[in-house]
């Protein structure tokens, strides 16, 4: 069996579900209720929510009642939550600015819970590389399997592109261009938009979030980290005008300290491939171009990924492929789909891959949870499956870990350093992490 192929649909395990404790699940608002909760709801045989923690216990109680979480308990303190033996996996779905102050004591308190096996943290891991390294060390010392929410790796479009590249359908990669729109960081700001995403240092900005997710996806698709990078980061829009829900200007301007434009270029370690990337803030538009375009040019063919938003990890993309071979999706039984009788192996063809009704916001997180389930229950019957692994790297199987997050944090740190120094940096050792 080839474990580097894309996963087939997993079977439902005949075992007790993974018991999940949430920090940040709120039925009234937030990222967790929009993504994590519906994903778990679709995998109710594999996961069960058993614990909630919020600084205000009333929020957790209200969430349990509203979502009818009959097996869940609301905990009054972080210590009592982390110590509970009813939790197998803790999910951190709060603002990045609070990750360090919550996760560090949580890992210490969790030593009283012998059943804790998994720690799942939303990207970014922390507000800085130093904080991220500290969280990684604490999690490693605690001995839990870690997961980071770089869910773009689970997008069906990214996995298909990765297959086409890894199986040689486009030959050797010659060059890559990326252009994206970061949306929030233009001249206008919705009045109800949270203030923290416009303030530098909170771990949510054009470089860390928009670029970070996209460049992780690119490295994953191409199975290569960068060797050299050069970057320019701009904040040319230091103030934004507030607008209401209908787009009407409110006559009030507010400060913005996060970047609104990024120019990035570099070369991949594998093949010395040049990569150019531009991300801008501003009102997304469908009038002239897509808000995300990734062009990958090879010696035998080309790939193009397009999306209506500059956030590849939560967008329903379209994948275009032009080359000499395609249309060989693996079937569930491991066999190849039959080619069209009129198919000419030497003739250039084009493939358009798009799932019309795919909800990428929930779907990619759902696939991430499915991968955790596959690992926990070994639903693919992989012989000698390890009880833990340090990083996913570029493997098809598994899920991204805090080590994968550290490597990405180091690249982002290098982006800001390159901008500050005005020079090209050697980042070839970025994945050789010794702590």
Swiss-Prot record:
One of its GO terms (cellular component) is transcription regulator complex. Keywords: Acetylation, Carbohydrate metabolism, DNA-binding, Galactose metabolism, Repressor, Transcription, Transcription regulation. SUPFAM superfamilies: Glyceraldehyde-3-phosphate dehydrogenase-like, C-terminal domain (SSF55347), NAD(P)-binding Rossmann-fold domains (SSF51735). The keyword Acetylation applies. It holds the Pfam family Gal80p_C-like. The modification N-acetylmethionine is found at residue 1. This protein is a negative regulator for the gene expression of the lactose/galactose metabolic genes. It binds to GAL4 and so blocks transcriptional activation by it, in the absence of an inducing sugar. To K.lactis GAL80. Monomer. This is Galactose/lactose metabolism regulatory protein GAL80. It comes from Saccharomyces cerevisiae (strain ATCC 204508 / S288c).
């Amino acid at each position: 069996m080839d474990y580097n192929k894309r996963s087939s649909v997993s079977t439902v395990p005949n075992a007790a579900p993974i018991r999940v404790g949430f920090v940040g699940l709120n039925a009234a608002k937030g990222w967790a209720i929009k993504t994590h909760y519906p994903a778990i709801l679709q995998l109710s045989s594999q996961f069960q929510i058993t614990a909630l923690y919020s600084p205000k216990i009333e929020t957790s109680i209200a969430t349990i009642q509203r979502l009818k979480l009959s097996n869940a308990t609301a905990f009054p303190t972080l210590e009592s939550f982390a110590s509970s033996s009813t939790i197998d996996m803790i999910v951190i779905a709060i603002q990045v600015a609070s990750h360090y102050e919550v996760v560090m004591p949580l890992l210490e308190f969790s030593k009283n819970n012998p059943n804790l096996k998994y720690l799942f943290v939303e990207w970014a891991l922390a507000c800085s590389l130093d904080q991220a390294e500290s969280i990684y060390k604490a999690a490693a010392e605690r001995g839990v399997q870690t997961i980071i929410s770089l869910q773009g790796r689970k997008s069906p479009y990214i996995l298909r592109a990765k297959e086409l590249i890894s199986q040689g359908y486009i030959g050797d990669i010659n060059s890559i261009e990326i252009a994206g729109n970061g949306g929030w960081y233009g001249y206008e700001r919705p009045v109800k938009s949270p203030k923290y995403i416009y303030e530098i240092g909170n771990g949510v900005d054009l470089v860390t979030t928009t670029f970070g997710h996209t460049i992780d996806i690119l490295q994953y698709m191409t199975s290569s980290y960068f060797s050299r990078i050069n970057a320019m980061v701009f904040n040319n829009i230091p103030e934004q005008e507030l607008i209401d829900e209908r787009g009407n200007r409110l006559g009030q301007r507010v400060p913005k300290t996060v970047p609104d434009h990024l120019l990035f270029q570099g070369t991949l370690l594998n093949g010395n491939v040049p990569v150019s990337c531009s991300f801008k803030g501003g009102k997304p538009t469908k009038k002239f171009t897509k808000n995300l375009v990734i062009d990958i040019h090879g010696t035998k063919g080309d790939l193009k990924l397009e999306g209506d938003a500059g956030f590849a990890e939560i967008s329903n993309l379209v994948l275009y492929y032009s080359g000499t071979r395609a249309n060989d999706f693996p079937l569930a039984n491991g066999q190849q789909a039959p080619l069209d009788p009129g198919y000419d192996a030497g003739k250039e063809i084009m493939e358009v891959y798009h799932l019309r009704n795919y909800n990428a916001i929930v779907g990619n997180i759902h696939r991430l949870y499915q991968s955790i389930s596959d690992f926990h229950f070994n639903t693919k019957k992989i012989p000698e499956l390890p009880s833990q692994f340090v990083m996913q790297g570029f493997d098809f199987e598994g899920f991204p870990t805090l080590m994968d997050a550290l490597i990405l944090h180091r690249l982002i740190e290098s982006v800001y350093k390159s901008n500050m120094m005005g020079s090209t940096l050697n980042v070839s050792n970025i994945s050789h992490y010794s702590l």
